[in-house]
Swiss-Prot record:
It comes from Thermomicrobium roseum (strain ATCC 27502 / DSM 5159 / P-2). InterPro entries: Ribosomal_bS20 (IPR002583), Ribosomal_bS20_sf (IPR036510). Binds directly to 16S ribosomal RNA. One of its GO terms (molecular function) is small ribosomal subunit rRNA binding. GO terms for biological process: translation. Pfam families: Ribosomal_S20p. Belongs to the bacterial ribosomal protein bS20 family. Keywords: Ribonucleoprotein, Ribosomal protein, RNA-binding, rRNA-binding. One of its GO terms (cellular component) is cytosol. The lineage of its organism: Bacteria, Pseudomonadati, Thermomicrobiota, Thermomicrobia, Thermomicrobiales. This is Small ribosomal subunit protein bS20.
Length: 99
């Protein structure tokens, strides 16, 4: 319970920011989960589109201060590393089948 008017205002402001930050973090997590699920299913074209959305959301969340910029960079890196490994494996399978 705030003791002063300014503390009450700060509490309201803090709650608004907490909810806004939670929205950005949730959106980022949702896109990452969707991308992982599509990659596991083998749908790389759809995964590429969702990864673009995930990266955009992570960048915006970092810009708005919902997550730290290094956290966003790490998540993007891990997502792309997994995606690129799948693409590389798919290309190698295609080359082996054609020879």
């Amino acid at each position: 319970m705030p003791n002063t008017k300014s503390a009450a205002r700060a509490l309201r402001r803090s709650e608004r920011r907490r909810l806004r930050n939670r929205m950005w973090r949730s959106m980022a997590r949702t896109f990452i989960k969707k991308a992982r699920k599509l990659m596991e299913a083998g749908d790389l074209e759809a995964a590429a589109r969702v990864i673009g959305d995930a990266i955009s959301t992570l960048d915006r969340a970092a810009a708005k201060g919902a997550i730290h910029k290094n956290n966003a960079a790490r998540r993007k890196s891990r997502l792309m590393k997994r995606f690129n490994a799948l693409v590389k494996a798919r290309l190698q399978q295609g080359q082996e089948q054609s020879t």
